[in-house]
């Protein structure tokens, strides 16, 4: 699985066991991504942070 880094023109290959790509955004009107990468379990959203997870190459 290949996941985008913070700047989507760059990506990395995920290590074994991390089979989801994620995008973390501050929960505001703009929803600008502040972090991207590989993860094994999609975190729950909170009042301040929203996560979007997916399982295909460079989907984040």
Curated annotation (Swiss-Prot):
GO function terms (MF aspect): toxin activity
Protein name: Cytotoxin 4
Pfam families noted in UniProt: Toxin_cobra-type (PF21947)
Keywords from the UniProt entry: Cardiotoxin, Cytolysis, Disulfide bond, Membrane, Secreted, Target cell membrane, Target membrane, Toxin
GO CC terms of this entry: extracellular region; membrane; other organism cell membrane
Subunit (UniProt): Monomer in solution; Homodimer and oligomer in the presence of negatively charged lipids forming a pore with a size ranging between 20 and 30 Angstroms.
Keyword NAD annotated: no
Protein function: Shows cytolytic activity on many different cells by forming pore in lipid membranes. In vivo, increases heart rate or kills the animal by cardiac arrest. In addition, it binds to heparin with high affinity, interacts with Kv channel-interacting protein 1 (KCNIP1) in a calcium-independent manner, and binds to integrin alpha-V/beta-3 (ITGAV/ITGB3) with moderate affinity.
SUPFAM superfamilies recorded: Snake toxin-like
Protein localization: Secreted; Target cell membrane
Disulfide bonds: 3-21, 14-38, 42-53, 54-59
Family the entry assigns: Belongs to the three-finger toxin family. Short-chain subfamily. Type IA cytotoxin sub-subfamily.
Chief location: secreted
Keyword Oxidoreductase annotated: no
Tissue expression profile of the protein: Expressed by the venom gland.
Annotated GO biological process: killing of cells of another organism
UniProt superkingdom: Eukaryota
CDD domains in the cross-refs: TFP_snake_toxin
